[in-house]
């Protein structure tokens, strides 16, 4: 849809195009606008530049989802519409109900609403908080961010979550990548070669030189880059991805003048990505990764949304355009990575810009608690983090060596002395199809430890399709009874339709008859089920009957402080 304006005083005006996109198999609508400025033709007076001070790319008047007679805080979750755009930053573990690029407003023309104050927020507006203050010259165009509107079919939390997860798989299919990641805490070439060999032996798939490892992705020295280029080649020859870490925000830039010039920045300090330092920083990262042939990039502290009031930075003119410029710079880096097949680990919601994975429920102090507490917290974080994310969109954390504290009680090293705990962490994570940053000096320290790692890696890879499928929430971990989840894949052409994992935090055996919601597997009438034990062996199959709701009643038996699982087949 185009909006064209007649020339004024012989000078052509920009054209505004409105684009809509719909998608197969999911009720999602995408909308964006583009401002196109025709090229000045020969003999025509030079046209001026125009500034897109601000824009509203969408405005919807919604049916109020609830009647509020008196004032109270509005609950976004009651809407039957979910909105997200790719203009988002500053949200680590989940997407906030309202972003920097959209908001709900009061509709002043709605005078008959139930609320006495007439302040029911029922008009959705897609517009940036700042700017964008972008100038368009002849022959150029301006493209807004993309707004995505997902229409729910009901109020059930699980169904809404399934819709969200399908949306991400459709709009950002790279989020389905789910490699096994070893966070190496040293960057010495000799120990990295040992890590390559350990990953090759156990089946781990990527090595990230972690924070605190001593690796410097900002180095411009050719000799230094050559070292890691050779290591990346060796990793690739072993079938592994290889890359490193860099911190963007929550640090000082090269000079104080290169920091964001604003009051109360999110991390108290941080570089402006439109400053000279910020521009050189991103260029250096790209040069290093491309030269060395890296295939994974961990970017801590992506652009968090701070405006910058400096009028001296080369990348922006002032405060009004600073947010747009910095967001574009960060998103362009991830798109550049995506174009080259570089996997991006980033603790922020940059999925629609090319990011692969963010935190599932990451809090540093949690991984300094005693090991037994970490086991429960881990399952709680996975349960909570997979309502709106697929399992592959979130990473967890396993402190093989000490992290922020806690000493020997919080760490797994020496690994051979804590095999039961190491096994339990793999059961939590790979039983949920969730990858963690296994951070430490090594993956195994004995043949017994190596056997535990290989057992779980082989299990995950042998059942990868169903373990990476949608996760249905059964019972949240509370340390008082069983907890667990159910993976489901209703595809007609697959044999494994479901895989359920159950965990027992108690010191006594748990035996329960539970209702298993096999409706989500696409099966009707009956299902073939096989029991799995802690050695990951399967029993002979038995048949379970499904009622009209698609529910099967199944007895589960879980040994003390252990786990069991069920494989559901058609």
Each language-model region and where it sits:
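C-terminal beta-strand-rich structural cap/linker in extracellular carbohydrate-active enzymes
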Residues: 543-570
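An acidic-aromatic substrate-binding cleft motif
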Residues: 157-206, 210-213
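Short, acidic/polar
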Residues: 187-201, 278-290, 422
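Polysaccharide-binding surfaces and accessory modules of carbohydrate-active proteins
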Residues: 1-121, 130, 525-541
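Aromatic- and carboxylate-enriched substrate-binding clefts and catalytic-loop regions
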Residues: 210-404
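Conserved, mostly hydrophobic/aromatic
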Residues: 33, 139, 199, 300, ...
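Short Pro-Gly-centered flexible turn/kink motifs
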Residues: 134-153, 559-569
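Active-site-proximal substrate-binding groove within the catalytic cores of carbohydrate-active enzymes
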Residues: 330-538, 553-555
């Amino acid at each position: 849809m185009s909006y064209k304006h007649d020339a004024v005083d012989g000078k052509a005006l920009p054209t505004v195009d409105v684009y809509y996109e719909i998608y197969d198999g999911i009720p999602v609508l995408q909308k964006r606008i583009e401002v196109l400025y025709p090229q000045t033709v020969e003999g025509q007076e030079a046209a001026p530049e125009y500034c897109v001070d601000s824009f509203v790319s969408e405005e919807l008047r919604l049916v109020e989802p609830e009647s509020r007679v008196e004032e109270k805080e509005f609950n976004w979750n009651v809407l039957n519409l979910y909105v997200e755009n790719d203009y988002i930053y500053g949200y680590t573990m989940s997407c906030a109900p309202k972003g920097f690029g959209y908001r709900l407003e009061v509709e002043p023309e709605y005078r008959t609403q139930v609320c006495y104050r007439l302040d029911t927020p029922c008009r959705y507006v897609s517009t940036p908080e700042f700017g964008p203050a972008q100038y368009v010259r002849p022959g150029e165009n301006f493209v807004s961010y993309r707004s995505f509107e997902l229409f729910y079919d009901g109020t059930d939390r699980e169904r809404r979550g399934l819709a969200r997860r399908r949306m991400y798989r459709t709009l950002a299919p790279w989020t389905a990548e789910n490699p096994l990641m070893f966070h190496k805490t040293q960057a010495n070439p000799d120990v990295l070669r040992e890590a390559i060999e350990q990953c090759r032996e156990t089946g781990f798939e990527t090595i990230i030189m972690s924070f605190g490892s001593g690796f410097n992705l900002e180095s411009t020295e050719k000799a230094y880059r050559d070292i890691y280029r050779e290591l990346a080649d060796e990793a690739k020859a072993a079938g592994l991805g290889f890359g490193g870490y860099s911190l963007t925000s929550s640090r000082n830039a090269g000079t104080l003048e290169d920091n964001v010039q604003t009051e109360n920045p999110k991390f108290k300090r941080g570089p402006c990505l439109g400053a000279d330092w910020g521009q050189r920083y991103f260029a250096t990262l790209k040069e290093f990764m491309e030269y060395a042939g890296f295939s994974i990039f961990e970017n801590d502290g992506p652009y968090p949304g701070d405006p910058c009031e400096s009028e001296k930075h080369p990348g922006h003119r002032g405060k009004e355009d600073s947010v747009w410029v910095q967001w574009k710079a960060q998103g362009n880096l991830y798109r550049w990575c995506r174009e080259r097949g570089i996997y991006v680990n980033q603790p922020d919601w940059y999925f629609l810009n090319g990011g692969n994975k963010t935190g599932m429920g990451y809090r540093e102090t949690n991984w300094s608690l005693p090991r037994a507490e970490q086991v429960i917290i881990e399952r709680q974080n996975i349960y909570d983090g997979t309502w709106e994310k697929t399992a592959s969109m979130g990473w967890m954390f396993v402190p093989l060596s000490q992290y922020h504290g806690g000493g020997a009680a919080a760490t797994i090293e020496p690994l051979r002395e804590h095999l039961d705990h190491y096994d339990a962490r793999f059961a939590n994570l790979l039983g949920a199809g969730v990858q963690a940053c296994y951070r430490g000096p090594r993956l195994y320290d004995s043949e017994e430890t190596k056997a535990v790692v290989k057992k779980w890696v082989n299990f995950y890879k042998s059942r990868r399709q169903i373990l990476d499928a949608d996760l249905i929430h059964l019972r949240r971990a509370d340390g008082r009874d069983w907890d667990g989840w159910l993976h489901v894949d209703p595809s007609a052409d697959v044999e494994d339709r479901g895989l359920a994992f159950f965990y027992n935090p108690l010191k006594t055996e748990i035996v329960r008859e539970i209702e298993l919601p096999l409706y989500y597997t696409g099966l009707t009438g009956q299902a073939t089920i096989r029991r799995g034990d802690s050695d990951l062996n399967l029993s002979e199959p038995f048949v379970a009957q499904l009622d009209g709701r698609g529910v099967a009643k199944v007895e589960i038996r879980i040994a003390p402080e252990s786990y069991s699982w069920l494989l559901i087949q058609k």
